[in-house]
Amino acid sequence: MAEFTSAEKVNIGYENEYSTDAMTGGPDKRRQLYYQLIQSMKKAESVDIIVSFLMESGVRMLLKELEYTLKRGAKIRILTGNYLGITQPSALYLIKRKLGDRVDLRFYCEKGRSFHPKSYIFHYTDHSELYIGSSNISRSALTSGIEWNYRFSSQKDPENYKEFFRTFEDLFVNHSIIIDDKELKRYSQNWHRPAVAKDLDRYDFAQSETNDTKIKPLYEPRGAQIEALCALEDTRAEGAQKALIQAATGIGKTFLAAFDSKKYEKVLFVAHREEILKQAAVSFQNVRNSKDYGFFMGAEKCTDKPLIFASVASLGKPEYLNEKYFASDYFDYVVIDEFHHAVNDQYRRIVEYFRPQFLLGLTATPERMDGKNIYEICDYNVPYEISLKDGINKGMLVPFHYYGIYDETDYTKLHIVKGKYAEEELNRTYIGNAYRHELIYKYYCKYGSR
């Protein structure tokens, strides 16, 4: 999906761009708030933003310009709301991850009053200008959505400017709380995707479909991936060399590993199935924009590429874990997929042999039926986790239904070996059970994928 990430990427000549004080949105880019904000941001000595909510899509659009503004030495303050949970945690994490503490980011905290302002204030050497209207920070609100915004200068209307800015200062200083790591984590853990967010996301998606299709798509972290990346950066800053990420299937753990390992030169990705390795290779290729990788599995034993995707069955053999193939410190970053298997012999040999700068374990199911402890392998360090339930509540995964169907198959005559049904007997029971086959097909036809 195409992304507007900076003024350069949208290929607009701002020096000759038509400037207007009245922005009404729609398809004409000259009437969209985003392009006017960029012009103001390029010159401002400080920026104050007050909006009722932040969406990841809007933050992503403004991120590069905010970063350039900070590099020029300008100060940025942002006050937003947390009422009804419309502000997305990923939007806040994105600001924290890319801009850090250089931005003074706060929540409006007075519970007794509604909070719906939308204003962008830019301060220059001899004057200020203020945009006020209907646009929060989301893609559609900043671009083609029908939003009415007006800009005026402190020189042309000093009295009204003073009133607006005085109110902003009062709200920011006296009616806000700083969004530090603790507050952000608390907000994220309690956040459920509100119903209205579905409409906002739909508007943003529709807007992305109408963007300039000549812009090269960028692979960038989304949602929970942004939160997990922040957690991983924090844990490394504290000195951790190993970590386990627990995330439900569908969150995007492989892409997360690709994003997190991007700064490391030599990376090893370990999984137990060839299909997973090939899919992971494509993900890493897209994130790194490089096909310089190889596989270590079956008959293929690549050892000279910066990215190696290895099967446990091959790499886990003692004859391959030596200097002839890989030095123990060859890889800077090691990813162990399906980390709940890491207590098994082949996985353990791999984990114990290599000495990377950082080891990342990925799993959706950390609990094991045999009671073996996988947490000790990653030094009991789990910086981020998101369950299936949380993923659904946050709108990152689709909800589903379980259907319990009674099965009359008789298991009483099967032998139990080491606490389990004898595998051959169980297979015969299933394979030769025509009634069970018909039952499965009947209810498959009834429910399908609804």
Map each language-model feature to its residues.
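Conserved helix/coil segment N-terminal to the catalytic DExD/H
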Residues: 298-330, 344-349
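Pre-Walker A adenine-sensing motif
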Residues: 225-237
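Conserved interdomain linker/interface between the two RecA-like ATPase lobes of SF2 helicase motors
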Residues: 382-449
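Conserved RecA-like ASCE P-loop NTPase motor core of nucleic-acid helicases/translocases
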Residues: 52, 267-273, 450
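PLD/PLD-like phosphodiesterase catalytic module centered on the HKD motif
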Residues: 1-222, 226
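Conserved helix-turn-beta segment of the N-terminal RecA-like "Helicase ATP-binding" lobe
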Residues: 267, 275-300
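Walker A/P-loop
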Residues: 237-260
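Post-DEXD/H (motif II) to motif III coupling segment of the RecA-like Helicase ATP-binding lobe
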Residues: 340-402
